[in-house]
Amino acid sequence: MDNEKGTSSSDLTTRQRKPLGWKAMPYIIGNETLERLATFGLMANFMVYMVREYHMDQVQAVTLINTWSALTNFAPIIGAFISDSYTGKFNTIVFGSIAELLGMLVLTFTSLVPNLRPPPCTADQITGQCIPYSYSQLYVLLSGLFLLSVGTGGIRSCSVPFSLDQFDDSTEEGREGSRSFFSWYYTTHTIVQLVSMTLVLYVQNNISWGIGFAIPTVLNFFALLLLFVGTRYYVFVKPEGSVFSGVFKVLVAAYKKRKARFTSGIDYHQPLLETDLQSNKLVLTDQFRFLNKAVIVMNNDEAGNEEWRTCTVRQIEDIKSIISIIPIFASSIIGFLAMNQQQTFTVSQALKMDLQFPGTSYLIPPASITVISLLNIGIWLPFYETVLVRHIENITKQNGGISLLQKVGIGNIFSISTMLISGIVERKRRDLSLNGVKMSVFWLTPQQVLMGFYQVFTIVGLTEFFNKQVPINMRSIGNSLLYLGLSLASYLSSAMVSIVHSVTARGGQSWLTDDIDKSKLDCFYYFIAALSTLNFIFFFWCARRYRYRNYSNEQ
């Protein structure tokens, strides 16, 4: 919007209005929370929708879900670039909210208009082959999913950075607010996910798919209204142009001066610009020293081409911070694989288990089993933030109790444990099922609880890490690295499912078949556990060598 105003990096310039902190949060978080109600509620039960209503087999449904999930998680990196470079965070969130609303409308129509999906299976067809979906029906379905992905790219890339803009990090209250924000942010998402995984799923499975899709669609509309209502409370930060131009400038300048040598009394390029005033407060670090040469002022740095021959200390240290988080980002991709499997194959397991709630005749919707994980998050996160952190701080004398990467590392251990327990439970379930006995679905509880702990530590930790360890003018991009990692993990998961299915089938029996009772899903889980263990060793090595940066204090 035109009323987005810039914030400078020094005391010489001020924000248009004083940051109001938590007063602005209900409107920003409320918007994204309702957005996740739509996407998470949809993803949790969408496999059932495609199998029952579009007559897809399990492999087709899993492949489509993983592909859509990957696109949805990749979209925020595009939204972040557009936001940080051109449109600003608020405008990007508004655009994303509108696209998401349109996507939900399309999917709602697919459930209400019979011609937009295949006809129901008849009694004779159930034992044979049901009428498949047509290409036109598939295109309508995919268009709705695409709009959802576009909307997600605008909302998720900017909600957290836009929220952090509302805290004044120059005050103790503002710093404490921004630190605790991440836990409460994830807690609100968990509560809404509980609603989507219980109420919405119940409506979809027992009343109507149309009503089940219409509920989050209506909520998305109110989320957009809520975002506009809160405009009087927001602080707007003006984008500074292409955020990657500074990166390329440093690389070009460092290459051109690769033969230069540092000597005593050397000149540094330190212009006192409003957008870069803090650069004269920094010193060059010895990390990635080959980039330091970009700051040297040479005799042939004429005014005409100086822009691409000289860089500030600020620009050089910013690109160093980006390079230094790449190994952590890479390790997170493998770490997400365990979560991917819990979101796909757990539903397949539940469909083959006893879904009856103990002591009642109520049948639990298969996709609702992940509610156990959400309950664990909803209980543990507030307890951790309000009680446990204070005690840990007294012991470690460190703000937050433990470092961000220590938190991520603890979560990775839970991820490995999740896959090991999942393999043990699946082996027992399959053995009983082959003997005509259905295991209670509540045997999936241990792995769901462990996955909840993984999200509490790793997902929350990575969200804070990627937002606080990048330059402030690149926060949207930093925040989107989490979703980029999830996207790449989804693609990797799809590729692994295909490769494992193809390779193991050569031996006569594939680990992953349409009939889970004839599969060896437990072996696949153990394979993911082994990969996660190797990944944890790599992460530990990288984390030990990482140097933290405090951009709030620099600003």
Curated annotation (Swiss-Prot):
InterPro entries: MFS_trans_sf, POT_fam. The keyword Membrane applies. GO terms for cellular component: membrane. Not detected. It is a multi-pass membrane protein. PANTHER family: OLIGOPEPTIDE TRANSPORTER-RELATED (PTHR11654). This is Putative protein NRT1/ PTR FAMILY 2.14. It comes from Arabidopsis thaliana. The lineage of its organism: Eukaryota, Viridiplantae, Streptophyta, Embryophyta, Tracheophyta. The gene is NPF2.14.
